[in-house]
Amino acid sequence: MSELVLVVEDDPANAVLVDAILSSVGGFEVVCSDDGDEILNVIQERPVVAVLMDVSLGSTRLGGEKVDGVALTRRIRDLPEGINLPVILLTAHAMKGDRERLLFESSANDYVAKPIIDQKGLVELVRRHIKAAEAVRAELGARDTP
């Protein structure tokens, strides 16, 4: 079974593009959604290895309220399953200072500017963060063992 990556994107064309890159180039199983409640449920119910999160999310709702990708990422971090889950922001916000501000505000792991041009680079970035998260989990597990 393939590793599961969630794509949180409210623009259908962008969702299809990121899904195609991750599934065909990366070999991942991909679930795309713009429903915040669904995203949190999937993270709690299935072994998700990474989340790619659009920052703007004009139509995304969580508990009936409109949220952006920064707020939804913070909610993911509140879940036990989300503490060490790699979250990579996808955004057209590419002005000087946007990267640092968005990473700080959201507690995401990384940032990719749209449009996505380097497909292999995106897959490599996702894999790098998955590997780092696995190393952290292994280290934490080793500390818990007497």
Locations of regions flagged by a protein language model:
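Acidic, metal-coordinating helix/loop segments flanking the phosphotransfer/catalytic sites
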Residues: 32-60
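Conserved acidic carboxylate
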Residues: 9
